Regions:
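Proline-centered turn/helix-capping motifs that create local helix->coil transitions or kinks
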Residues: 54-56, 107-110, 155-159
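Non-heme Fe(II)/2-oxoglutarate
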Residues: 4, 11, 20-103
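Fe(II)/2-oxoglutarate
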Residues: 1-27, 232-248
Length: 248
């Protein structure tokens, strides 16, 4: 391992040992925020190679009131730039996943070599992500999605722009916790049918700025606990606004 990897792994191991109780007790569902996760150099390298808006790597998600953003369409590891690839490999390593298991209590985590739904995300001015619970299943691997990890890459950020990650209660009545997407901030949280999250208010950053992140998902072969299941079958995201329309 390189120096930055050793440093980040030591930090994760210490956090997993000291903060498991904090993670599990967090409201509205288990989560943890880790600031200054990577070395300044490697976090800066990630930002420096972040694709431009017009890069062909981007897949456009433009669903009014649901999600308006850019998402990387990684077909293979050859599409991933060097610093990003090194961080992705590190976060998907056995040593890191053992730390995540120690922190969360979710054993035998599996990374996603297909990067389904994960990778780089970029939200421009007026972009949004409606409050939702994530899809629960990986079709290609036949495994259950259990954990989300987000690393933010916003060197310049003003909270007045909006764009904070909102964690909502399971009845979808209110935002309980709001987390600003600050540079080199890592967020780890459980994902299941009741872990509603998003940034539903259109982003008001200047036209030359954006909300940047790296997102990875982790899975288990064994099913999630029954009390985390609303929909038994494999499903994609459960969007708040779509559910409200169905109930209207």
């Amino acid at each position: 391992m390189t120096d930055w990897q050793n440093h980040a792994l030591d930090k994760l191991d210490q956090i997993a040992t000291s903060s498991a109780t904090v993670f599990k007790a967090a409201k509205p569902f288990p989560h943890l925020v880790v600031d200054n996760f990577l070395s300044t150099e490697i976090a800066g390298a990630l930002l420096n190679e972040f694709p431009a808006d017009f890069d062909p790597i981007w897949q456009i998600s433009d669903q009014k009131e649901i999600q308006i953003k850019l998402r990387s369409n990684w077909q293979s590891e050859t599409n991933i730039r060097p610093a990003t690839q090194s961080v992705v490999h590190f976060l998907n390593s056995g040593a890191v996943m053992k730390c995540f298991s120690k922190l969360t209590g979710i054993e035998k985590l599996i990374s996603d070599p297909y990067y389904t739904g994960g990778g780089l995300n970029c939200t421009k001015r007026n972009g949004l992500l409606d409050v939702h619970a994530d899809g629960n299943w990986h079709d290609a691997m036949g495994v259950h999605r259990r954990l989300n990890v987000i690393l933010y890459l916003n060197k310049i950020w003003d909270p007045s722009w909006g764009g904070a990650l909102e964690l909502w209660d399971e009845k979808l009545t209110k935002c309980v916790t709001s987390i600003d997407p600050l540079f080199n901030r890592l967020i780890i949280f459980e994902t299941h049918d009741l872990t509603y999250h998003g940034h539903p208010t259109p982003l008001m950053c200047p036209p030359d700025q954006s909300r940047k992140s790296l997102i990875l998902y982790y899975y288990t072969a064994s099913p999630r606990p029954k009390n985390q299941i609303l929909v038994e079958r494999p499903h994609r995201a459960l969007w708040r606004k779509r559910q409200m329309r169905e109930l209207a």
